[in-house]
Design a protein with these regions (language model features):
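Short coil/turn segments at secondary-structure boundaries
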Residues: 17-24, 128-130, 202-205, 222-229, ...
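Non-catalytic DNA-recognition/assembly elements of restriction-modification systems
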Residues: 1-15, 149-163, 174-219, 346-359, ...
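A short beta-sheet element
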Residues: 30, 56-118, 234, 261-321, ...
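A short glycine-rich beta-alpha junction/loop motif
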Residues: 2, 90-98, 126, 130-156, ...
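Sequence-specific dsDNA recognition surfaces
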Residues: 4-18, 33-65, 72, 207-222, ...
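Short amphipathic beta-strand starts and helix->beta connectors
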Residues: 84-85, 129-134, 287-289, 329-333
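Short amphipathic alpha-helical coupling segments at ligand-binding clamshell hinges
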Residues: 109-113, 154, 164, 312-319, ...
């Protein structure tokens, strides 16, 4: 094992400068340009006026590793890393980040060092180096860099490891694109069969959403509660999912006692994002199937429980995900947009014949089966979702992939 500080030296501090009033400033990368895949999003790079001299070494070069020094949250620790592959000597990085540059590229392949740090972050390895002050998560960067160790293997093996991981990433991206196309196919099929639910050009019979079911706001928790551990569906679990059928994988919360029945999710419940600082998330919905696993939902969510057999869950869920219905759900909060039961009560849902809804449900099942086939094809091709690369010890565990 080799100390990271021997490989890169101390992390260089970033620059922020002043507002760019001329439009001729220097592009500066921020943590908002970080992605969770370890690559840089160049779409929203700001420019800043940097007047400080002697910062030539801070201009980024291919193979540089940028580490997050400040940010994160209770759920996602600080310490993310991204790999720089942009133009040399063009970009700087801001003061919430640091630069790690391999000193001897002939001994240490920069991408290998990056993958080691990336995998360590995914394992939660930076959490013990966090310093929390007034809600802000700071990385004790010098301590982390001086103590973190990278597995030593020869250069040929380093390159081989990275080639395999890069290939895996390409396949993952290809699979994501295929899944997105399948999702678009579901949307197109829905419109073909039922039309736009707000315009209702097919003139289906309609019913108010709350005439067909009931709503319940989620639970508010207290950090000092203890005694009962229970899985909890929160806003961060929605992502772009339509269905969550393994609630055992959700995070848990501590409560003083088991929630009452009305706060426990049941199969076929639909849960909405009720409130969030990101307006784009408000109104998102998922159908949940907890089975026998006791599962509650957070106070930032609303649970809808269908009580009318006039609609099926696959059909209703797709109605609620259409752009026109999402616009109807848009609240009017100032900083935090809100969805409430009154807004949901004003939603008018077309009710096509149940036979047609069942046809759509069968179509969705076939699409879901195709998604599973993509999953197993990737396994057959030698790229399972759980990938271990071994040297003397396990150095990388991409369990999220």
């Amino acid at each position: 094992m080799a100390k990271l500080i021997e490989i890169t030296g101390k992390a260089l501090s970033g620059e922020w400068g002043k507002d760019d009033e001329t439009g001729n400033g220097v592009p500066v990368l921020r943590t908002t340009n970080f992605t969770n895949e370890g690559i840089i999003d160049y779409n929203s790079v700001v420019t800043r006026t940097i007047t400080k001299k002697n910062i030539g070494e801070k201009f980024l070069r291919k193979g540089d590793i940028i580490i997050e020094k400040s940010g994160g949250s209770d759920k996602f620790p600080v310490g993310r890393v991204v790999y720089f592959d942009g133009d040399d000597n063009t970009y700087l990085f801001n003061n919430f980040t640091g630069l790690l540059r391999v000193k001897e590229p002939k001994m240490w392949y920069p991408r290998y060092v990056f993958y080691s740090l990336f995998a360590n972050y995914k394992r939660g390895g930076t959490r013990m180096f966090e310093n929390k002050t007034t809600g802000l998560h700071n990385l004790k960067t010098d301590d982390y860099v001086s103590r973190y160790e990278v597995t030593e293997i020869d250069m040929i093996e380093q390159v081989s490891v990275c080639d395999k991981l890069d290939k895996l990433y390409e396949i993952i991206n290809e699979r994501k694109q295929q899944l997105e196309l399948l999702d678009e196919l579901v949307k197109a099929r829905f419109v073909e069969m039922f039309g736009d639910p707000v315009i209702n050009e097919k003139e289906w019979v309609t019913k108010p959403l709350l005439d067909m079911g009931i709503c319940k706001n989620g639970m508010n928790f207290h950090y000092n509660d203890c005694g009962v551990e229970i899985n909890c569906l929160g806003v961060g679990d929605f992502k772009n999912l339509s269905v969550i059928d393994n609630t055992e994988q959700l995070s848990t919360v501590s409560l003083n006692e088991m929630p009452s029945e009305e706060y426990l999710l049941k199969d076929d419940d639909i849960v909405f994002v009720r409130s969030n600082g990101n307006k784009a998330l408000v109104g998102r919905s998922v159908a949940v199937y907890p089975g026998d696993i006791p599962t509650t939902f957070s106070g930032f969510c609303i649970r809808y429980r269908k009580q009318d057999d006039a609609v099926t869950i696959p059909y209703l869920l797709r109605v609620l995900k259409t752009d026109s219905i999402r616009r109807k759900m848009a609240g009017r909060g100032a900083n935090i947009q809100n969805l409430n039961q009154q807004i949901l009560g004003n939603l008018i849902i077309p009710v096509p014949p149940i036979e047609l809804q069942n046809q759509f449900a069968d179509f969705v099942k076939r699409i879901d089966k195709s998604k599973v086939n993509y999953y197993y094809k990737n396994r057959k091709d030698g790229f399972p979702p759980l990938l271990f690369i071994y040297s003397v010890t396990t150095i990388i565990n991409l369990s999220d992939y």
